[in-house]
Amino acid sequence: MSAQSALSGLGAKLLSGEVEVVDCTGVLGPNTPILQLPPDFAKNTPKVEIHKISEYDSDGPFFAWNWMVLGEHSGTHFDAPHHWITGKDYSDGFTDTLDVQRLIAPVNVIDCSKESAADPDFLLTADLIKAWEAEHGEIGAGEWVVMRTDWDKRAGDEAAFLNADETGPHSPGPTPDAIEYLLSKKIVGWGSQCIGTDAGQAGGMEPPFPAHNLLHRDNCFGLASLANLDKLPAKGAILIAAPLKIERGTGSPIRALALVPKA
């Protein structure tokens, strides 16, 4: 089948509903949970603000529009390699210089929802990924891998979403060996349903924050605060995760969409 025929076929199946578009994005607004870092460690991203310019009134009689205060890494978002010190030297590591061909790819969905419900500090290891592959098939080069935890169900309550106490945040994520294994498979990027791509306690790992550290070291991408991964199959969907083309952007809120064969 030619590429033209394949695209025509996909278009027809989208129009017929045989291929469903699943929104993997959380709502972006003033109540969106935002990562909170210790003030003695680093500055924090401000909360999202939406301010009205006009709404069919004296400030604009025929139109409605707003202006916003918005951090690059707010809500469902994309981490570019330049986001982390290990990726700082890539000329194509910004949101305006990256290769857009890489942004749309098959997605592997590793379901860790039961484990994460039982233990908020659950860690996905390389051995668990290999066991998943034995059941569902190999993870291919250039593909996305995302960890389903159903953490998005907490997004309406920032305290529950961040899940922090005096020992720090508690949320599921990958181990260093999990990320190294995925990088050996030549993935394009890794995604999480939590506030960031790492586990809550990842600061104590070696290296610290391995998803950030290792992914961006290898010029790969991260996705965070994904939603509705429970609507995706383990394999067979296509993920579209395109950041805004921000000049020298280290990341961007995204509208993450998945193309899924309708059951």
Swiss-Prot record:
EC number: 3.5.2.20
Cofactor: Mn(2+)
Free-text comment on the cofactor: Binds 1 manganese ion per subunit.
GO molecular function, one term: manganese ion binding
InterPro entries documented for this protein: KFase/CYL, KFase_sf
Keywords for this protein: Hydrolase, Manganese, Metal-binding
Activity regulation, short description: Inhibited by thioisatinate.
GO biological process, one term: L-tryptophan catabolic process to kynurenine
Reaction equation(s) it catalyzes: isatin + H2O = isatinate + H(+)
Positions annotated as active site in the UniProt record: H83 (proton donor/acceptor)
Residue numbers binding substrate: F62, F63, A64, W65, N66, H212
SUPFAM superfamilies associated with the record: Putative cyclase
Subunit-structure text: Homodimer.
Free-text function comment from the UniProt entry: Involved in the degradation of the plant hormone indole-3-acetic acid (IAA). Catalyzes the hydrolysis of the cyclic amide bond (lactam) of isatin (1H-indole-2,3-dione) to yield isatinate (2-(2-aminophenyl)-2-oxoacetate).
Family: Belongs to the Cyclase 1 superfamily.
Listed name of the protein: Isatin hydrolase
Lineage: Bacteria, Pseudomonadati, Pseudomonadota, Alphaproteobacteria, Hyphomicrobiales
